[in-house]
Amino acid sequence: MLALISRLLDWFRSLFWKEEMELTLVGLQYSGKTTFVNVIASGQFSEDMIPTVGFNMRKVTKGNVTIKIWDIGGQPRFQSMWERYCRGVNAIVYMIDAADREKIEASRNELHNLLDKPQLQGIPVLVLGNKRDLPNALDEKQLIEKMNLSAIQDREICCYSISCKEKDNIDITLQWLIQHSKSRRS
């Protein structure tokens, strides 16, 4: 009986307290952006991902929060589109292949170049170091240092080490996004 009442209350709350947020997911190619979207949308991991050409848009509902995700291709020819799709969103999610140490400098430069754009000032950023299940992957502390995240002072910034394959820290990432959608409205 108590479970039924709880479910009814949740349903009733969802009628009046729906949250929506829009975010843009960017990062260098092969960092796991589309895989991340698939994992949070369906819980499914696939090794056979095709690189995103241009962009994909997907809506994911978690509880009473609907997240509209713009997944932008990471190839150099699409990086000029990043700023356009980051304007006006609730958050920017920047994905890094934490196991590919050769691309960390390029990834850092792209992130800082993007965040230097005046029209993106103040938009919170969630930096995700994906592929933590691989040997030699950077942990959160190393990512913060190598990506020079402490230099970013004009916005909220958060960093997590995740594995889409093992689904490590996906829940905490979603919690940050959902909490962020609620805090931006108040």
Swiss-Prot record:
<protein>
    <recommendedName>
        <fullName>ADP-ribosylation factor-like protein 8B</fullName>
        <ecNumber>3.6.5.2</ecNumber>
    </recommendedName>
</protein>
<keyword id="KW-0206">Cytoskeleton</keyword>
<dbReference type="InterPro" id="IPR044154">
    <property type="entry name" value="Arl8a/8b"/>
</dbReference>
<keyword id="KW-0159">Chromosome partition</keyword>
<dbReference type="InterPro" id="IPR027417">
    <property type="entry name" value="P-loop_NTPase"/>
</dbReference>
<dbReference type="GO" id="GO:0007059">
    <property type="term" value="P:chromosome segregation"/>
</dbReference>
<keyword id="KW-0653">Protein transport</keyword>
<dbReference type="InterPro" id="IPR006689">
    <property type="entry name" value="Small_GTPase_ARF/SAR"/>
</dbReference>
<dbReference type="GO" id="GO:0045202">
    <property type="term" value="C:synapse"/>
</dbReference>
<dbReference type="GO" id="GO:0015031">
    <property type="term" value="P:protein transport"/>
</dbReference>
<dbReference type="GO" id="GO:0005765">
    <property type="term" value="C:lysosomal membrane"/>
</dbReference>
<feature type="cross-link" description="Glycyl lysine isopeptide (Lys-Gly) (interchain with G-Cter in ubiquitin)">
    <location>
        <position position="141"/>
    </location>
</feature>
<dbReference type="GO" id="GO:0061909">
    <property type="term" value="P:autophagosome-lysosome fusion"/>
</dbReference>
<comment type="function">
    <text>Small GTPase which cycles between active GTP-bound and inactive GDP-bound states. In its active state, binds to a variety of effector proteins playing a key role in the regulation of lysosomal positioning which is important for nutrient sensing, natural killer cell-mediated cytotoxicity and antigen presentation. Along with its effectors, orchestrates lysosomal transport and fusion. Localizes specifically to lysosomal membranes and mediates anterograde lysosomal motility by recruiting PLEKHM2, which in turn recruits the motor protein kinesin-1 on lysosomes.</text>
</comment>
<keyword id="KW-0132">Cell division</keyword>
<dbReference type="Pfam" id="PF00025">
    <property type="entry name" value="Arf"/>
</dbReference>
<dbReference type="GO" id="GO:0002747">
    <property type="term" value="P:antigen processing and presentation following phagocytosis"/>
</dbReference>
<keyword id="KW-0966">Cell projection</keyword>
<dbReference type="GO" id="GO:0042267">
    <property type="term" value="P:natural killer cell mediated cytotoxicity"/>
</dbReference>
<keyword id="KW-0131">Cell cycle</keyword>
<keyword id="KW-0378">Hydrolase</keyword>
<dbReference type="GO" id="GO:0031902">
    <property type="term" value="C:late endosome membrane"/>
</dbReference>
<dbReference type="GO" id="GO:0090117">
    <property type="term" value="P:endosome to lysosome transport of low-density lipoprotein particle"/>
</dbReference>
<dbReference type="GO" id="GO:0005764">
    <property type="term" value="C:lysosome"/>
</dbReference>
<feature type="intramembrane region" description="Note=Mediates targeting to membranes">
    <location>
        <begin position="1"/>
        <end position="19"/>
    </location>
</feature>
<feature type="binding site">
    <location>
        <begin position="130"/>
        <end position="133"/>
    </location>
    <ligand>
        <name>GTP</name>
    </ligand>
</feature>
<dbReference type="GO" id="GO:1904115">
    <property type="term" value="C:axon cytoplasm"/>
</dbReference>
<dbReference type="GO" id="GO:0090385">
    <property type="term" value="P:phagosome-lysosome fusion"/>
</dbReference>
<dbReference type="GO" id="GO:0005829">
    <property type="term" value="C:cytosol"/>
</dbReference>
<dbReference type="GO" id="GO:0001778">
    <property type="term" value="P:plasma membrane repair"/>
</dbReference>
<keyword id="KW-0547">Nucleotide-binding</keyword>
<keyword id="KW-0813">Transport</keyword>
<feature type="binding site">
    <location>
        <begin position="29"/>
        <end position="35"/>
    </location>
    <ligand>
        <name>GTP</name>
    </ligand>
</feature>
<dbReference type="InterPro" id="IPR005225">
    <property type="entry name" value="Small_GTP-bd"/>
</dbReference>
<dbReference type="GO" id="GO:1990927">
    <property type="term" value="P:calcium ion regulated lysosome exocytosis"/>
</dbReference>
<keyword id="KW-0342">GTP-binding</keyword>
<keyword id="KW-1017">Isopeptide bond</keyword>
<dbReference type="GO" id="GO:0051301">
    <property type="term" value="P:cell division"/>
</dbReference>
<keyword id="KW-0472">Membrane</keyword>
<dbReference type="GO" id="GO:1902774">
    <property type="term" value="P:late endosome to lysosome transport"/>
</dbReference>
<keyword id="KW-0963">Cytoplasm</keyword>
<dbReference type="GO" id="GO:0032418">
    <property type="term" value="P:lysosome localization"/>
</dbReference>
